[in-house]
Amino acid sequence: MKFAIRDDDTSYFTKPQELEKAFGDLTGIPVSLSVIPNAKSNHGNVFPYGKGPFDREYGNVGDNLELVSYINKGIAKGKYEILMHGIHHEYYRINNDWIPEMMNIDYSEAVTLIKKYRKYLEETFNTKINTFVAPSNMMNKFIFRALDKIGMNTMSVLSKKFDRDISIHYLKYYIKRNINKATKQFDAIGVMKYKNHKELYMYIFKDFESAWKKYNLCKKYNLPFVFYTHYWELNSEPKLKSDLCKLIEMMIADGAKPSLVNECYK
């Protein structure tokens, strides 16, 4: 079976040394970087890049030439690939809650912005980008519709609620999800193929124990195991990094193949 690491939040404000610290010692393990095209310096009330001061409020990732050079070298070596991580990774304060940007956008705006910034990332890193990752893994039905229009894959977990346009594809996976939940106590499906895009389940990496449990469930049902990290958390929490290394070691010993996210859609 395949496993893949999706690491979120690389942006203009990221130093290449931070990515190297998080992943440079993971020899032979590729990492799919979810890159923010034009990042806001803070994410709501979360400050992944510290509290500044910053030289700008919004930063185009391509303006960080040192970072782009580092990532491009990693792409050439098969260490990294680029996924698109929202537009600004911006949050809006609504009724005392922080709402991620992809929950606060309509269809036409989504099509325009996603196409614009996908092209920007592809030109910046000289690579094809096929996968969109929503900040906080949250997006409204207009984003799903836009991604299908554009033909970009994504990662999501099907909800019990009807949270997107009704289609034959969606109903098929919605029913399968609920049957799996009832009979297997595990709602993952694997690759979900819609009209013009595909979707995959993914899991947060919190600790070794919970991740190992999810890995074994994916193995039992012959599904790819894709989990996501944040490089800035790995760098600030030694136990989290230690648990990640332990998980990788155990999965490889178990015969799992380290892969990039885009390889898991195949």
PLM regions and their residue ranges:
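Short catalytic/ligand-binding loop motif for oxyanion handling, primarily in non-cytosolic enzymes
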Residues: 12-14, 40-44, 90-95, 138-143, ...
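Short, conserved active-site loop motifs that form the nucleotide-linked donor/cofactor pocket
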Residues: 79-80, 256
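CE4/NodB-like, metal-dependent polysaccharide N-deacetylase domain
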Residues: 30, 104-140, 217-228
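Generic structural signal for well-ordered alpha-helices
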Residues: 17-23, 68-72, 111-118, 144, ...
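Active-site-adjacent pocket scaffolds in enzyme catalytic domains
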Residues: 43-72, 76, 131-225
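Active-site beta->alpha N-cap acidic-glycine motif
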Residues: 1-77, 123, 128, 227
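C-terminal domain-boundary segment and adjacent tail
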Residues: 154-156, 219-266
